[in-house]
Amino acid sequence: MVARERRARSAAATAVIGEEKVLACYCGASPIAGMKLLPHTRSCFVCGEANPAGLKLRFETDGRIVQTHFVPRAEHVGFRQTVHGGLIATLLDEIMVWACAVQTKRFSFCAELNVRFIGPVRPNEAVVARGELVSNRRDKLFEARAELRNQAGLALATATGKYLPITQAEATDMVTDFIGDPGWVFGAGT
């Protein structure tokens, strides 16, 4: 009964990213064929390699879809073998920020985040987060969507968000924190 209910909830998930409904989970340092690794930062909680409390995730893109692979640890639980919802929301927010950046060549701050939790995320269970830009309103507001799925392809959470582009001064400051080619995100000449 529980498995049937979970499948029904997964099928009812509204955010299907790209054309794939089932994701192959990849948990390594190299991108999946057709995907390119994006730069990362030193300080970010999600992708910062020098942040001792951070997740140290890497993001990859095909130029439209952005994805990352994550295996939550035991210390990420909020309640008995269930990863904290705030961490899941953080991951979905970050993937949408990157999706907006890849498409618009501008980073942004979250103005609104809506998360739908469909099923529990368990520690040590590999998951894939994917996101994409849905609309760009004259470079003043970006709308994106994201999903989190397990290795079996079941949707565990979906999200939508609205994002406000950062200022040029903030972007200039941000570039100094990047590791890798920031031109992939900010455009040539950065």
Where would I find each of the regions flagged by the language model?
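Catalytic strand-loop segment that frames the active site of acyl-thioester-processing enzymes
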Residues: 40-83
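Hydrophobic beta-strand-centered segment that forms part of the acyl-chain substrate-binding groove
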Residues: 95-133, 141, 160
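Conserved active-site segments centered on acidic
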Residues: 92
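HotDog/MaoC-like acyl-thioester-processing domains
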Residues: 3-9, 13-35, 121-123, 134-190
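A generic structural signal for short beta-strands and their flanking turns/coil linkers
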Residues: 40-41, 53-55, 64-66, 109-113, ...
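Active-site region of the double-stranded beta-helix
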Residues: 86
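Hydrophobic residues in beta-strands and at strand termini
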Residues: 70-72, 117, 165
